[in-house]
Amino acid sequence: VDPVGSAALFKPYGVPDLVLVTDIHGDHFNKGTLEAIVKNKTVVITPEAVAALAPEGLKKRITTLANGKSVEKLGVKIEAVPMYNLTAARLRFHNKGRGNGYVMTFGGKRVYVSGDTEDIPEMRALKKIDAAFVCMNLPYTMTPEQAADAVREFKPKVVYPYHYRGSDTAQFKKLVGDASEVRLRDWYKN
């Protein structure tokens, strides 16, 4: 999901079977990275706004999904969940309908990746999520308090805060409490 940065970062993983892109911003969508890692067998899922900006050579590999739509590819059911801002001062960052969060169902498990979103009703309404990747990164998404409040509502079994640079992940974990198992990872080693 959202491969950005040097293509060398992805080399150890081989050619991806499936790539999902959540939004048009450079920390989610990098044309050069996609051109380097996407090969003939790779399935790419994006919102329409990303597909419109994709290089011509990649457009034929892309399946677009609008909010609320789903598709099955490679045995994975992929549901496009809205991701957007609610706060008036943040509406310019992520307007409703442009980007996607995703729920992927495979091997009997449901995994949610929020994309850049605030504490929206569509996220709170999610059910039976085994693992969730929830963002928190002001001014673009949520505070740790907002993210924890949402997680306490939809109760994924496990939650990984991601896209959190500068946010207090320890505070997030404390606020989630026993509603979900919080697993902290250092996504920013470099």
Question: What residue ranges belong to the model's regions?
Answer:
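Binuclear metal-ion centers of metallo-dependent hydrolases, dominated by the metallo-beta-lactamase
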Residues: G57-L74, A148, R152-N190
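Short alpha-helical
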Residues: A51-A52, E118-P121, S167
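Core dinuclear metal-dependent hydrolase active-site scaffold
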Residues: V1-G14, T64-K127, M142, D186-N190
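Active-site metal-binding motif and surrounding structural segment of the metallo-beta-lactamase
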Residues: G5-A52, T63, K127-F133
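Glycine-/small-residue-rich active-site loops that bind phosphorylated ligands and cofactors
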Residues: G26-F29, P139-M142, S167
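Active-site neighborhood of phospho(di)ester-bond hydrolases with catalytic His/Asp-centered motifs
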Residues: V1-P3, P16-D27, I45-E48, Y112-G115, ...
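Proline-aspartate-enriched helix->loop->beta-strand connector
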Residues: I129-V134, L138-P161
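A short acidic, amphipathic alpha-helical/loop segment
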Residues: G32-I37, L53-G57, E122-A125, Q146-A150, ...
